[in-house]
């Protein structure tokens, strides 16, 4: 009998004691913590799901976090409403490159219940190199990243075999690899070829954000009529956006000459995708709209702000300008692209335009934005053909990659999910190519071996 009384007392005592309880009425809620998503250097997103209120109303819910295990509401926390169900919590004020432990919580009259613990590591802060040709650029080693050192030499051997002049990998803006081949150096300029189309895309967007032009307006609004040999009604269908998207409807089989006699009507603008150098007319549009030369506007609004010292547009004939720069200058532009138009805290080109530029711009070639190539789409077109190819344009590379591609394998690869920029300059890897080649797939097999 004494044992029964003692046991009853113990059970009564335990039922009245909970480290999170503030009352003896009802039970604690039942809650789970949502997996972490969208982690940056200073923030993350989580949340919770309350499936039972324990018999009394949920008066407070959210997530709490700490650099120690099992955080409680006495640590940092969010407050995200009341009641049952799922909720999302935006966690801010975090420190970069730090491990955090996170739990969802729900408070009712019985106390505070906690969900399972989840962890996240905040990103390293994005680095931007100082301006200047001789500026020191911070590096990060293969070992620091936990990458595969044994995969480096096969990559470099392949690059040299394929007539590469220079190669760089940036992660979070820091140089991981920087290699020069066949007498090329860090100060040697090289041509971008059509990779430079992305410079034109960006500066066109800058001119639009300054109110100088609207890409939805027809090209002739800025440079007058007669810039093509198309009938006037057809010419007036062509907008600046059509030039950005490569769906002007002009004949792409007549070579690089962009004089009016060579810009001939094939289809209405917006109905046919074809890779065409008529995009260069956007430089005339910007010059006319700004009242400056293209070079002056480009240098002031983009080149100088990114510290792309010494880069220059060189007239290659046929009305085309080709950009030349060092490899590091190309990497600077790629780093701005990785940061959606931002450079060291300054928004060079607004993010809305940049997102449009790096997403599908029309419904014909899904792998093309505003003069940017896009990976991971269901199909793609290539220059000089109307064939549709199924699948991702570089299947060995991350699906979220977007690219600036130029003749003879001039490359800027931007991979947001990896916080990575990859640069390749040089002679053609194999036979002369306008943009895509088998080189891309093999190269990305070797790059992926670094981090997989």
Question: What feature does the model see in each segment?
Answer:
Residues 210-246, 290-325:
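Active-site helix/loop module of the DD-peptidase/beta-lactamase fold
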Residues 281-285, 321-342, 410-426:
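Active-site-proximal alpha-helical segments within enzyme catalytic domains
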Residues 360-421:
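Active-site Gly/Thr loop motif
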């Amino acid at each position: 009998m004494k044992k029964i009384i003692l046991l009853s007392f113990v059970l009564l005592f335990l039922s009245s004691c909970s480290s999170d309880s503030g009352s003896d009425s009802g039970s604690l809620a039942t809650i789970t913590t949502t997996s972490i998503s969208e982690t940056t250097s200073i923030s993350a997103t989580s949340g919770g799901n309350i499936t039972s209120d324990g018999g009394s109303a949920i008066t407070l819910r959210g997530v709490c976090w700490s650099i120690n295990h099992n955080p409680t509401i006495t640590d940092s926390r969010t407050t995200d409403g009341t009641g049952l169900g799922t909720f999302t919590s935006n966690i801010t004020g975090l420190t970069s490159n730090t491990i955090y432990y996170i739990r969802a919580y729900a408070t009712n009259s019985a106390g505070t219940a906690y969900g399972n613990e989840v962890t996240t590591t905040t990103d390293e802060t994005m680095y931007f190199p100082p301006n200047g040709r001789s500026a020191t650029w911070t590096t990060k080693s293969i070992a620091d990243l936990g990458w595969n050192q044994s995969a480096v030499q096969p990559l470099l051997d392949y690059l040299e075999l394929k007539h590469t002049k220079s190669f760089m990998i940036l992660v979070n803006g820091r140089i991981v690899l920087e290699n020069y081949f066949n007498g090329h150096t860090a100060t040697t300029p090289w041509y971008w070829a059509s990779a430079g189309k992305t410079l034109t895309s960006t500066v066109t967007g800058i001119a639009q954000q300054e109110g100088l032009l609207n890409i939805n307006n027809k090209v002739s609004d800025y440079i007058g009529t007669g810039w093509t040999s198309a009938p006037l009604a057809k010419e007036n269908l062509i907008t600046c956006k059509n030039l950005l998207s490569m769906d002007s409807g002009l004949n792409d089989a007549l070579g690089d000459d962009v004089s009016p006699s060579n810009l001939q009507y094939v289809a209405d603008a917006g109905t046919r995708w074809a890779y065409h150098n008529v995009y260069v007319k956007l430089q005339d549009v910007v010059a006319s709209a700004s009242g400056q030369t293209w070079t002056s506007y480009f240098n002031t609004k983009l080149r100088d702000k990114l510290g792309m010292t010494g880069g220059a547009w060189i007239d290659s004939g046929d009305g085309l300008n080709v950009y030349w720069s060092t490899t590091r200058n190309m990497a600077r532009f790629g780093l701005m692209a990785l940061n959606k138009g931002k450079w060291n805290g300054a928004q060079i080109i607004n993010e809305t335009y940049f997102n449009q530029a790096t997403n599908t711009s029309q419904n014909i070639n899904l792998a093309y934005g505003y003069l940017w190539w896009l990976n991971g789409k269901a199909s793609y077109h290539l220059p000089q053909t109307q064939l549709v190819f199924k699948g991702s344009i570089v299947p060995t590379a991350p699906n979220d990659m977007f690219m600036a591609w130029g003749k003879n394998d001039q490359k800027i690869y931007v991979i947001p999910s990896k916080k990575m920029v990859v640069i390749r300059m040089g002679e053609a890897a194999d036979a002369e190519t306008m943009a895509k080649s088998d080189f891309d797939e093999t190269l990305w097999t070797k790059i992926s071996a670094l981090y997989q």
